[in-house]
Amino acid sequence: METLRYRFDGQRGARAGLEHALVGVVASGNLEVLVERVPLEGAMEIDILTAARGFGAIWQAVLDDFAARHPLRDVRISINDVGATPAVVSLRLEQALDVLQGADA
């Protein structure tokens, strides 16, 4: 297992909604995403536990894209990954954010 941690400067808070949201499932080719509202001095933190070692540059690219589209303040995202593709990672991140902000996933 490899642990990765990223931190992004936030520009806006997540819309009103739940305090946390959990989407996905930890299974082969998939991942679980937990999003929580926490005081982080205006930052967004993303912690990843993955079975796929050596893909830090790909994770960085996917998360840079997500953070550019959603520069959220005071949000922690925890990802438990079992080899999901970048497209699945992006999908689950969007789903988790939708649930957190009160939309149906």
From Swiss-Prot:
Keyword Transferase annotated: no
GO annotations of cellular component type: cytoplasm
Entries under InterPro entries matching the protein: Mal_deCO2ase/Cit_lyase_ACP, Malonate_deCO2ase_dsu
Keyword Phosphoprotein: yes
Keywords per UniProt: Cytoplasm, Phosphoprotein
Any one GO molecular function term: acyl carrier activity
Compartments it resides in: Cytoplasm
Pfam family, one: ACP
Positions where O-(phosphoribosyl dephospho-coenzyme A)serine occurs in the chain: 28
Domain of life assignment: Bacteria
Modifications after synthesis and translation: Covalently binds the prosthetic group of malonate decarboxylase.
Family, as annotated: Belongs to the MdcC family.
Function, as annotated: Subunit of malonate decarboxylase, it is an acyl carrier protein to which acetyl and malonyl thioester residues are bound via a 2'-(5''-phosphoribosyl)-3'-dephospho-CoA prosthetic group and turn over during the catalytic mechanism.
Protein name: Malonate decarboxylase acyl carrier protein
Organism, scientific name: Xanthomonas axonopodis pv. citri (strain 306)
